[in-house]
């Protein structure tokens, strides 16, 4: 399975590890994915892998 949020499409980013001696090596920053059950607009529930930031946004929108 790809490490991609199924709602926003947020995926891995590329960056550097930086040591105290300022040596740089490539690394990947992975999104914080969570598997949750999401209730869709038509009333059905579906298991989705979404980013934690997306989950916070959904909770905020549903509370209004």
UniProtKB/Swiss-Prot annotation:
GO molecular function: structural constituent of ribosome
A GO-annotated cellular component: ribonucleoprotein complex
Gene Ontology process terms (BP): translation
Key words, A-Z: Ribonucleoprotein, Ribosomal protein
UniProt KW Transcription keyword: no
InterPro entries according to UniProt: Bacterial_rp_bL28, Ribosomal_bL28, Ribosomal_bL28/bL31-like_sf, Ribosomal_bL28_bact-type, Ribosomal_bL28_sf
Keyword Ribosomal protein: yes
Pfam families in alphabetical order: Ribosomal_L28 (PF00830)
Family: Belongs to the bacterial ribosomal protein bL28 family.
HAMAP family: Ribosomal_bL28
UniProt-recorded name of the protein: Large ribosomal subunit protein bL28
Organism: Campylobacter jejuni subsp. doylei (strain ATCC BAA-1458 / RM4099 / 269.97)
Lineage: Bacteria, Pseudomonadati, Campylobacterota, Epsilonproteobacteria, Campylobacterales
